[in-house]
Amino acid sequence: MITGAIKSGRVDKVWVIPSGYPPKKEAAALTPAPYRYYMTEAALKSIEGCEVLPIEMLRPEKSYTTDTLSYIREEGVAGPDDKLILIYGTDILFELETWYHPERIVRQAELLLARRPGVLQESTLRKATELEEKYGIEISYFPIEGVNISSREIRRTGDYSKLAAPVRQFIARHDLYPKENPLVFLKDETHALLFEYETKLFRELSRERLLHSLNTAVLSVRYAVRFGISPDEAAVAGLLHDCAKQLPIALQASMAKKVMGEPLPDNSLLHAPAGQIYAAERYGIDNESILSAIRYHTTGRENMTTLEKIVYLADKLEPARDYTDLTAIRALAEKDLDEAVIACLKAVRDKFEQKRTAFHADSSRALDSLIRRSKTKIESITETTQQTEEKMDTLALSNEIIEILKNKKAEDVELIPISDKTALADYFIIATGTSTTHIKALSDEVELLMKQNRNLTPDHIEGQSTSRWILIDYKDIVVHIFHPEERAHYSLDKLWMTKRPEDTNIVELPES
């Protein structure tokens, strides 16, 4: 279409403006805007007379064509004597009237439509005449060669052979269209927030740094869904983990000092504590779990939260990372989060030792605490195996927790065996509270009675600040107490009751 428009002689140049946040499409079905922008650049960079403009990437609001045309005029992108022409296929004739203020659009720009070989269908000509009479305009056409290609079909089949080589390479490098898209688990408001953040990051980060941040966000969401924490928090933490990375070093240092005082770490690590401050001040993040995950994404720390582990791993394992063979750690991350973080920390330690560089103290403490936790879990399993007559098994404990929840009026309580799907735990218990107050009361009751009756203390508890989804981790048993809206959205029961399709990219590790 672009080359046809240029050859037609009707235009001097072609501007291609990838949509930012199109109002007529579901956010969950959209590939994140920076991916689409950079992929378009890769596809069109060799076409003379064509330029890709980031106009809709710079505006955080929904992208309406009339507003984009106004921006082009008001910001001087086009000169006062330039004529603006909108180039589309003829299918636009049947959609134009549903757009936001079509009467403005046709006053702001002429319509030049691509016509495939052959005679225009009668219905198309009739619609064109109807629009010309309704709006007092003249619609023009230019010929193009027929191309039998559909973006929807390409995504469905995964056959990218008809795409330009730079686009195929881009898709492969960033794993853009996996069979399972983790972003469908995000709330609509999270998608809107992510686009707002992306427009700011687009101005402040390099192309490669922004793509890395997006990759980290997507992988963080995948791990969050896999290991049972909020994918919305994981998406934000993953996207913003490097938000301060390309600020001036002096500014990074001053921000880091607010968090950790003196002495400051090496310059290469400043962006993590600085990012905690910058994410709060620039992006309005007030969720302490997210801010902590940003702060510790480079080093880890002792007793890391699940979100911190996920962002730490996603930063190191996102698909564009190719500085070493990550196959084994990536495979491990699909099954056992702690063991994957241990393997990653050990790999970093070994690399530093080879360079004769000091292993960061926080990383050392993180590794030690995870190894202790792993040993404790192994010892606990061994002891349980050896003393089954003295200890109640996890199924019996799960049933006891279920009884506590039901006695406290929890709704839709379910027990899900997951030991055959992951090393994370043996069972998930999922329950619903009627309100945030009820959810907090259910959590407190489980914690209190399991301590009194079985001398069991949770390894950690997450979500008490909002009480819309509280996670109580008893190592082999993980209790999820949801607000009804959160449970309906995340559907953990359906996710874990259904076996995950085999991922051909995953290499199985030996049982040892």
Locate the predicted segments by residue:
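Polybasic/polar functional segments that serve as interface/processing modules
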Residues: I381-A423, T436-I470, P484-E485, L495-S512
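Active-site beta-strand termini and strand-to-loop segments that position acidic
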Residues: I472-Y474
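Divalent metal-dependent catalytic cores for phosphoryl transfer on phosphate-bearing substrates
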Residues: T199-E204, H212, V221-L345
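Short, charge-patterned binding micro-sites
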Residues: P23-K24, A29-L30, L58-R59, P417-T432, ...
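Charged phosphate-binding loop/patch that engages nucleotide di/tri-phosphates or the phosphate backbone
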Residues: Y160-E189, D350-I381, E508-S512
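Nucleotidyltransferase catalytic core that binds NTPs
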Residues: M1-E189
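Helix-adjacent hinge/juxtasegments
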Residues: G49-E56, K62-A78, D82-T90, L247, ...
